Amino acid sequence: MMRKAKVGDVRTIQRLIEASASNGEMLPRSLSEIYDHLRDFYICEVDRSLVGACALHICWEDLAEIRSLAVSQGERQKGIGSKLVRACLREAKRLGIRKVFVLTYRPSFFQKFGFDIVDKAVLPHKIWSDCLKCVKFPDCDEIAMILQL
C-alpha cells in the first residue's frame, strides 16, 4: 500500500535511509530533517510493514527534487521504488512543478522515467542548500538528472 507518511513512520523511515546510507547509496538524514520534511514523504507498506520511502522536496516555483528513495533490502527488485517515484511525479504534476531532478548513483533506474543526465551547475538552489552540508562537497560523485514534466 502506498500512502503519505505519518509522524509514527519517522523512525522507520530513518532506519531505511540509514541502511542505504551505510552502503554509500545516499546521504543519511537525521530525525530532525525527516520530521521537518515529513510532508514530502511517501511510504510503501507490505503486510503492514514499512518497506520503502521516497520524498518529493519542492525547491523553487518550478523545481522539485526526488530524494531519499530507500527500499528495504529484502523488498528490492519488486517495483516498490518505481511506485514511490511515480507517486512523487504525480504529485509534482498536480502541484504544477515543471522540472524534477535527482542526484543518484543509479542513473539507469531514473532513465526509465525519462530523466536525462545534466550538469550539476543547472541546479543552483540544490547546490547551495543541501550540498554545502555534504561530506563529499565539493567533490560530489552523484549524477544529476532532470525530468521535464
Identify the residue ranges that each predicted region occupies:
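A short helix-loop-beta-strand connector motif used in the catalytic cores of GNAT acetyltransferases and
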Residues: 33-47, 138-141
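Short active-site oxyanion
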Residues: 1, 94-100
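A short, internal acetyl-CoA/4′-phosphopantetheine-binding micro-motif in the GNAT/acyltransferase core
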Residues: 69-76, 105-106
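Conserved acetyl-CoA-binding loop-helix of GNAT-fold acetyltransferases
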Residues: 77-90, 102
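Short amphipathic alpha-helix that is part of the acyltransferase structural core
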Residues: 1-28, 45, 142-148
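C-terminal "cap" of GNAT-fold acetyltransferases
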Residues: 123-149
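Conserved beta-strand in the GNAT
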Residues: 43, 49-58, 62-70
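Conserved active-site alpha-helix within GNAT-family acetyltransferase domains
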Residues: 98, 104-130
